[in-house]
Amino acid sequence: MKKSKKFLCLLLALVMAGSLLLLPAAAANTQQSGAERYPTVYVHGLMGWGARDQIYAVTPYWGLTSDLMPYLTGKGYESYAASVGPLSSAWDRACELYAQLTGTTVDYGAAHAAEYGHARYGVTYDKPLFEGWSADKKINLVGHSFGGATIRLFLDILADGSAEEQAAAKAAGTEVSPFFQGGKADWVYSLTTLAAPHNGTTFLECCGDMTQFAAEASTAMAKLLGISDFKGVYDFQLEQFGFYRKDGETVLEALDRVLHSDFLSHNDNVFRDLTIDRALALNDDIEIQPNVYYFSSAGDKTRPSALTGKRTSAADLTPLFVPLAHHTCRFSNPTTPDGFQL
């Protein structure tokens, strides 16, 4: 209970901090903060889920034992839990977030779809996450873990658009998504990240076999759930890669098709974007928006060893993560595959 209260206090403090700094001291008690004036949209990380997934009603990602969204809304902070692809790349997730906020069909972009060999369009959201998103009704963005990379790229595209996607749509004779047209930086008030791997993670480098197993196992789960009646329970949202049951297709036909598809080879997924080299490439493309307030809260559950002085897992770390932290702390390769010096 104490940990839950501590986390909630931190979350509220981060979301509100930027807007509170804007208010004169004398007016602090009479004016609303940005978190009170504008809705806050929460974006989950790797293998996470949002309110659109049925599992959220049983085990909410934001809160786990109880849903933080209605609690925060009841306190005057309008809050929503977005659902984006648990294994999808930052680009694909950003496109899904835009479609979810606007109640439209996901458009991954003609150029992007052609480059990575998947369909241009994905799922259709029948209604927006909430009504009225605009420059007059901005949003506060909160991203946990890989959700941090997602919302940073989302804001960058929202603000600057994509000249490549505009050109590709024009060449194809199709309409470009408003998302890729840019000019909407003023639709976001603040951006907050929680334990986000902004520069990638060495875990993928030091635990290659474990990472490969996790990638293959989660991909197999995505394929099986994607064609089953349980898709809505936990939706991987990989329609662009064909992970769904087509009209008139039997379960066995769909199973044979998806099992022979290779999602990981497309390099358009979370496992690639979490590498240090790819994360740095994303960072090079992402610009800071001058009128948006940014906050980042890091986490560290390692401590210096009393015997060696080197970092090791903290005594109060969740047992499941102890071996992972141990391997990560032992990583010593000073150079990434693309030659970046750590």
Where on the chain are the PLM-derived regions?
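Sec-dependent signal peptide cleavage junction
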Residues: L20-S33
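Hydrophobic core
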Residues: L12-M16, L20
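Helical cap/lid subdomain of alpha/beta-hydrolase-fold lipid enzymes
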Residues: D156, E164-L342
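Bacterial N-terminal signal peptides that target proteins for export
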Residues: K2-L11
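Intrinsically disordered, low-complexity regions enriched in polar/acidic and amide residues
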Residues: A13, T30-Q31, F340
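N-terminal non-catalytic accessory region
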Residues: Q31-A196, G200-A215
